[in-house]
Regions:
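Conserved ABC transporter NBD signature motif
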Residues: 9-27
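Helix-to-loop junction immediately C-terminal to a conserved catalytic motif
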Residues: 1-2
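Helical segment within the ABC ATPase nucleotide-binding domain
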Residues: 127-139, 151
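ABC ATPase nucleotide-binding domain "signature" region
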Residues: 93-94, 100-105
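Catalytic Walker B motif of ABC-type/P-loop ATPase nucleotide-binding domains
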Residues: 113-117
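ABC ATPase nucleotide-binding domain helical subdomain, centered on the C-loop/LSGGQ "ABC signature"
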Residues: 10-12, 44-87, 131-132, 140
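A short, proline-enriched helix->beta-strand linker immediately N-terminal to the Walker B motif
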Residues: 107-111, 140
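H-loop (His-switch) and adjacent beta-strand-loop-beta switch element
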Residues: 155-170
Length: 170
Protein backbone atom coordinates (compact mmCIF):
# COMPACT_ATOMS: atom_id res chain seq x y z
CA UNK A 1 0.00 0.00 0.00
CA UNK A 2 1.41 3.37 -0.97
CA UNK A 3 0.90 6.50 1.07
CA UNK A 4 -0.01 9.64 -0.83
CA UNK A 5 1.81 12.89 -0.25
CA UNK A 6 -0.41 15.64 1.19
CA UNK A 7 -1.30 18.39 -1.29
CA UNK A 8 -0.39 20.93 1.39
CA UNK A 9 0.93 20.88 4.93
CA UNK A 10 2.59 17.87 6.47
CA UNK A 11 1.64 14.72 8.34
CA UNK A 12 3.49 13.85 11.53
CA UNK A 13 3.26 10.83 13.78
CA UNK A 14 4.61 11.26 17.30
CA UNK A 15 6.17 14.54 16.11
CA UNK A 16 8.11 12.79 13.33
CA UNK A 17 7.40 13.76 9.72
CA UNK A 18 5.71 10.81 8.01
CA UNK A 19 8.09 11.15 5.05
CA UNK A 20 11.02 10.26 7.34
CA UNK A 21 9.37 7.09 8.69
CA UNK A 22 7.35 6.04 5.63
CA UNK A 23 8.78 2.52 5.25
CA UNK A 24 8.50 1.69 8.94
CA UNK A 25 4.98 3.11 9.02
CA UNK A 26 3.84 1.11 5.98
CA UNK A 27 4.98 -2.10 7.67
CA UNK A 28 2.52 -1.42 10.48
CA UNK A 29 -0.56 -1.32 8.22
CA UNK A 30 -2.70 -4.08 6.70
CA UNK A 31 -5.19 -2.76 4.17
CA UNK A 32 -8.21 -4.76 3.05
CA UNK A 33 -9.77 -2.92 0.10
CA UNK A 34 -13.22 -3.12 -1.42
CA UNK A 35 -11.65 -3.79 -4.82
CA UNK A 36 -8.90 -6.35 -4.47
CA UNK A 37 -6.70 -8.34 -6.79
CA UNK A 38 -6.89 -12.13 -6.85
CA UNK A 39 -3.94 -13.97 -8.37
CA UNK A 40 -4.47 -16.74 -10.93
CA UNK A 41 -2.79 -19.04 -8.44
CA UNK A 42 -3.55 -21.22 -5.43
CA UNK A 43 -5.73 -20.29 -2.51
CA UNK A 44 -2.59 -20.33 -0.32
CA UNK A 45 -0.57 -18.09 -2.67
CA UNK A 46 -3.43 -15.59 -2.61
CA UNK A 47 -3.29 -15.48 1.19
CA UNK A 48 0.51 -15.17 1.29
CA UNK A 49 0.62 -12.69 -1.63
CA UNK A 50 3.70 -10.56 -0.86
CA UNK A 51 4.73 -12.40 2.31
CA UNK A 52 7.79 -14.66 2.50
CA UNK A 53 6.77 -18.00 0.96
CA UNK A 54 9.64 -19.78 2.75
CA UNK A 55 8.24 -18.88 6.17
CA UNK A 56 4.64 -20.14 5.80
CA UNK A 57 2.94 -20.53 9.17
CA UNK A 58 0.31 -23.15 8.32
CA UNK A 59 -1.29 -23.00 11.80
CA UNK A 60 -1.71 -19.25 11.35
CA UNK A 61 -3.21 -19.83 7.88
CA UNK A 62 -5.71 -22.32 9.35
CA UNK A 63 -6.69 -19.90 12.15
CA UNK A 64 -7.28 -17.16 9.60
CA UNK A 65 -9.36 -19.48 7.42
CA UNK A 66 -11.63 -20.10 10.42
CA UNK A 67 -11.68 -16.40 11.30
CA UNK A 68 -12.83 -15.56 7.74
CA UNK A 69 -15.22 -18.54 7.54
CA UNK A 70 -13.24 -20.05 4.67
CA UNK A 71 -12.20 -23.29 6.39
CA UNK A 72 -15.16 -25.35 5.11
CA UNK A 73 -14.70 -24.01 1.59
CA UNK A 74 -11.00 -24.95 1.56
CA UNK A 75 -11.80 -28.39 3.00
CA UNK A 76 -14.21 -28.95 0.08
CA UNK A 77 -11.78 -27.80 -2.63
CA UNK A 78 -10.25 -30.62 -4.71
CA UNK A 79 -6.68 -29.70 -3.71
CA UNK A 80 -7.44 -27.73 -0.55
CA UNK A 81 -5.14 -24.73 -0.15
CA UNK A 82 -3.30 -25.73 -3.35
CA UNK A 83 -6.44 -25.34 -5.50
CA UNK A 84 -6.03 -22.73 -8.25
CA UNK A 85 -8.76 -20.10 -7.92
CA UNK A 86 -8.60 -18.99 -11.57
CA UNK A 87 -8.00 -15.61 -13.17
CA UNK A 88 -9.31 -12.84 -10.90
CA UNK A 89 -10.71 -15.56 -8.62
CA UNK A 90 -13.43 -16.47 -11.13
CA UNK A 91 -13.92 -19.85 -9.46
CA UNK A 92 -15.02 -18.03 -6.29
CA UNK A 93 -18.20 -16.13 -5.50
CA UNK A 94 -17.89 -12.42 -4.74
CA UNK A 95 -18.22 -13.08 -1.01
CA UNK A 96 -15.64 -15.89 -1.08
CA UNK A 97 -13.18 -13.70 -2.99
CA UNK A 98 -13.71 -10.85 -0.53
CA UNK A 99 -13.06 -13.18 2.41
CA UNK A 100 -9.89 -14.40 0.65
CA UNK A 101 -8.72 -10.78 0.38
CA UNK A 102 -9.52 -10.37 4.07
CA UNK A 103 -7.47 -13.49 4.90
CA UNK A 104 -4.55 -11.96 2.99
CA UNK A 105 -4.71 -8.77 5.05
CA UNK A 106 -5.04 -10.65 8.32
CA UNK A 107 -2.12 -12.98 7.54
CA UNK A 108 0.14 -9.91 7.48
CA UNK A 109 -0.69 -9.51 11.19
CA UNK A 110 0.14 -5.82 11.46
CA UNK A 111 -0.67 -3.32 14.20
CA UNK A 112 -3.18 -1.30 12.18
CA UNK A 113 -5.96 -2.94 10.17
CA UNK A 114 -7.80 -0.78 7.62
CA UNK A 115 -10.98 -2.25 6.14
CA UNK A 116 -12.35 -0.29 3.19
CA UNK A 117 -15.91 -1.51 2.54
CA UNK A 118 -14.40 -4.95 3.20
CA UNK A 119 -17.71 -6.71 3.94
CA UNK A 120 -19.92 -5.31 1.17
CA UNK A 121 -20.00 -8.56 -0.87
CA UNK A 122 -20.86 -10.76 2.12
CA UNK A 123 -24.28 -12.11 3.00
CA UNK A 124 -25.72 -10.73 6.24
CA UNK A 125 -25.03 -13.85 8.34
CA UNK A 126 -21.39 -14.15 7.24
CA UNK A 127 -20.87 -10.40 7.61
CA UNK A 128 -22.18 -10.51 11.20
CA UNK A 129 -19.85 -13.39 12.12
CA UNK A 130 -16.79 -11.80 10.55
CA UNK A 131 -17.51 -8.37 12.06
CA UNK A 132 -17.71 -10.02 15.49
CA UNK A 133 -14.30 -11.60 14.87
CA UNK A 134 -12.86 -8.29 13.67
CA UNK A 135 -14.15 -6.45 16.73
CA UNK A 136 -12.42 -9.05 18.92
CA UNK A 137 -9.13 -7.89 17.35
CA UNK A 138 -9.47 -4.37 18.75
CA UNK A 139 -7.90 -5.61 21.98
CA UNK A 140 -4.59 -5.99 20.14
CA UNK A 141 -4.87 -3.83 17.00
CA UNK A 142 -6.04 -0.43 15.85
CA UNK A 143 -8.94 -1.03 13.49
CA UNK A 144 -10.11 1.57 10.99
CA UNK A 145 -13.31 0.73 9.14
CA UNK A 146 -14.40 2.70 6.09
CA UNK A 147 -18.07 2.03 5.39
CA UNK A 148 -21.35 3.49 4.21
CA UNK A 149 -23.22 0.71 6.06
CA UNK A 150 -24.82 2.18 9.18
CA UNK A 151 -24.99 -1.25 10.83
CA UNK A 152 -21.20 -1.53 10.53
CA UNK A 153 -20.67 2.04 11.75
CA UNK A 154 -22.86 1.36 14.81
CA UNK A 155 -20.27 -1.21 15.93
CA UNK A 156 -17.45 1.35 15.96
CA UNK A 157 -16.19 3.14 19.08
CA UNK A 158 -15.75 6.39 17.17
CA UNK A 159 -17.16 7.48 13.83
CA UNK A 160 -15.63 10.25 11.74
CA UNK A 161 -17.94 11.49 9.01
CA UNK A 162 -16.43 13.39 6.11
CA UNK A 163 -18.68 15.90 4.36
CA UNK A 164 -17.19 18.37 1.96
CA UNK A 165 -14.04 19.74 3.58
CA UNK A 166 -15.09 18.91 7.13
CA UNK A 167 -14.59 15.93 9.41
CA UNK A 168 -17.17 15.45 12.15
CA UNK A 169 -16.51 13.07 15.05
CA UNK A 170 -19.68 11.40 16.31
Amino acid sequence: MNLLEPSSGKISIDNLPLASIRNAWQKKISYIPQNFYILDDSFLENILFSEDKKQVEINKVNQILKFCHLDNLVDDLPEGLNTIVGPSGKLLSGGQAQRLAMARGLYQDRDILILDEATNALDKDTEDKILKNILDLKKSKTIIIISHNQKVLDLCDKVIEFKGNKANIN
